[in-house]
Amino acid sequence: MSADYFADFQTVRYEGPDSDNDFAYRWYDKDRVILGKRMEDHLRFAVCMWHTFCWPGSDVFGAGTFTRPWLQGPMDARNAAAKREAALAFVEKLDVPFYCFHDVDVMAEAEGIGEFRSSFAEAVDHLEELQGKHGRKLLWGTANLFGHPRYMAGAATNPDPEVFAWGASQVRDALEATHRLGGANYVLWGGREGYDSILNTEIGIEQENFGRFLSLVVDHKHRIGFKGTILIEPKPHEPTKHQYDFDTQTVFGFLKRFGLESEVKVNIEANHATLSGHTFEHELAMARALGILGSIDANRGDHQNGWDTDQFPNSVEELTLAMLELIRAGGFTDGGFNFDAKVRRQSIDAADLFHGHIGGIDTIAHALVKAAALIEDGKLDAFRAERYAGWQGELGRKIHADGTTLADIADIAVARDLAPVRRSGRQEWCENLINRV
């Protein structure tokens, strides 16, 4: 039944920029070689389960508008299986390699920890079968530690250690399932790992517990032999007012505090970056500089709204800047572009799921083409290198040399009567270079 939901749609193929086929790629040519690598291997696209197959089209003002067959009635074993079948069939029709899930996205509803584990185990068995049937792979798995009322005050940072333990059970099973299914990464998004009021919150206790939880996850990864990457997904707020994983730089400081900076990387979401007051490319550049760039959740926010709207990306210009940072970082190792995006509430047809993903995929592919052209042209990177060339000279090396003191550097400035010559940052010229490609 569920796979038939997409029976009227053919597999999406590349037809080139001049195609007028709404169900074809204009820029995503998966076998095109760019900078020595196939486009599919550069981008590693994934479809998410939660927005695409679990969200009913509801919002805080109204009920769901979608009539997906697997959303009719309770989320029992039958509907959960139908949802899984539809999801993997859809990923195959898009001709992208990966999908992503939370545990609760793929399983029947359950009461109690025993029933929860049993229901999830049944789902994992089925997913393993479906991956083989459809030739798709898992980019990453995760556990939903924010949706159930037990997590109203968080999981790892909850005042109640019993909730911490419940969360540990979910993460153990989700991590082991990710390992079994050949997942490339495991993600931790702390949607409620934060607080709403300082009046009832002990920040010190919560951060220690958060660090302990993450350390336990890393330890379990090694115990079971999982070779993928553990990822944290930064977000400044929503649903809590203050979240501890505010942005990439905050996460890195947290990882350093608990000695995990070589064990954990970040999964950066575009909309979360803008909520934190940064641009998407800033967060990618920061992760690159800190050596913790792992994976990307592709979406966009609304410039007029201060919340996480999770729209499909549609700005080639903005994503070209992001792709420059990804290329400079050496590209993905285990990560990829997961579409953490949803069609709008009025987009109720099955075709809309294709339009949203096709548009996002083509936007990112087009941005890759433009970013590669900028890299191959070399002017922008040459200017950046020239701007910082002084740090490769005698004084720059002296400043960083072991044993050099603040007084030593100050004495050089005085002895040489330094009078630095100002040089233009040429920002407008740089912006013009971007617009030429």
Curated annotation (Swiss-Prot):
It is found in: Cytoplasm. Mg(2+) 2 binds at residues 269, 272, 308, 310. It is an enzyme of class 5 (isomerase). Its cofactor is Mg(2+). Keywords: Carbohydrate metabolism, Cytoplasm, Isomerase, Magnesium, Metal-binding, Xylose metabolism. Transmembrane segments: none annotated. Its EC number is 5.3.1.5. Its main location: cytoplasm. InterPro entries: Xyl_isomerase-like_sf, Xylose_isom_bac, Xylose_isomerase. The active site is at residues 102, 105. Binds 2 magnesium ions per subunit. Belongs to the xylose isomerase family. Homotetramer. PANTHER family: PTHR48408, XYLOSE ISOMERASE (PTHR48408:SF1). This is Xylose isomerase. It comes from Novosphingobium aromaticivorans (strain ATCC 700278 / DSM 12444 / CCUG 56034 / CIP 105152 / NBRC 16084 / F199).
